[in-house]
Design a protein with these regions (language model features):
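Solvent-exposed, non-transmembrane amphipathic alpha-helical segments
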Residues: 57, 61, 72, 97-101, ...
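Short, Lys/Arg-enriched charge-dense amphipathic segments
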Residues: 69-80, 92-93, 109-119, 175-181, ...
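Basic/polar N-terminal segments that are highly enriched at the extreme N-terminus
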Residues: 1, 104, 109-110, 116, ...
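Short, structured beta-strand/loop micro-motifs enriched in basic residues and often containing a Trp
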Residues: 102-104, 112-126, 146-150
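N-terminal intrinsically disordered, low-complexity, charge/repeat-rich segments that act as generic
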Residues: 1-106
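Generic detector of short, locally flexible boundary/turn motifs and exposed helical patches
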Residues: 3, 42-44, 103-108, 131-134, ...
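Basic/aromatic-rich interaction segments and small domains that mediate binding to polyanionic partners
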Residues: 12-38, 80-81, 124-136, 143-225
Length: 225
């Protein structure tokens, strides 16, 4: 996660104003189109979920702070479409198609297949021979923040929980490892754990220090204290 993308416990962003389900799903008509474009493009099989997330993280900081939620989605989608050679900057400027992308057209999402495809989802659970390193109830400590293999790379370990102690509350089956999958290094599935952290261990002055924060963390993020 980039610093801008990883906002937990960060100062200077103002209060969070939850809507408690009162706001419409899409505040503007184009928001729904942005979601549809992103989902439909993902079915072209040119990138995976973790690559898509990393594309949004890589937006220029000035753009990321200025863009609305779905503007971030469109900007990240635009960047990855160009990076994968499916769209050119000239096509984006003119609105006129020039590239031959017939080789990926076979994967396009049709109207008839939308409901079934979305219901099927994209499960990230995998079967491996890996034996879980940690057990239920065991105390663990997270590693320092950052992707250990790719400088500035994608990771699902938030900075506010880095180098912190917690306890294992659930041991899940292996799941695709985002730190590898986002950068073309394969799925590299690892055991996934739900780890409980006391709020007082994550932040210096929490309102309720004994509250617990539950995070799903991969085995590579954890070590013995």
């Amino acid at each position: 996660m980039s610093r801008l993308h990883d906002m937990g416990g960060r100062f200077g962003d103002g209060p969070v104003a939850p809507d408690f389900g009162q706001e419409p799903v899409f505040k503007e008509e184009w928001h729904g189109r942005a979601l549809a474009l992103t989902v439909a493009s993902g079915f072209l099989r040119q990138w995976n979920l973790d690559e898509g997330r990393h594309a949004r993280e890589c937006l220029a900081p000035m753009d990321y702070t200025a863009f609305s939620y779905y503007e971030k989605w469109l900007a990240g989608l635009t960047d990855i479409l160009v990076a994968k050679g499916l769209v050119t900057p000239e096509e984006l400027s003119t609105g006129q198609a020039a590239l031959d992308v017939s080789d990926v057209a076979q994967h396009k999402l049709t109207q008839e297949s939308v409901a079934e495809s979305l219901a099927r989802g994209g499960p990230s659970e995998r079967q491996t021979d890996e034996t879980p390193k940690f057990a239920l109830g065991e105390q663990v400590k997270t590693i320092p923040a950052g992707n250990r293999s790719v400088a500035g790379g994608h990771t699902r370990l938030p900075s506010y929980a880095a180098s912190c102690s917690g306890r294992i509350v659930t041991v899940h089956p292996p799941h695709v490892f985002p730190d590898a999958n986002a950068h073309g290094y394969g799925e590299a599935a690892e055991t996934l754990y739900t780890v409980a952290f006391k709020a007082g261990d994550l932040w210096q002055h929490p309102e309720n220090p004994t509250d617990e924060v539950m995070l799903d963390l991969w085995q590579s993020y954890l070590e013995t204290p």
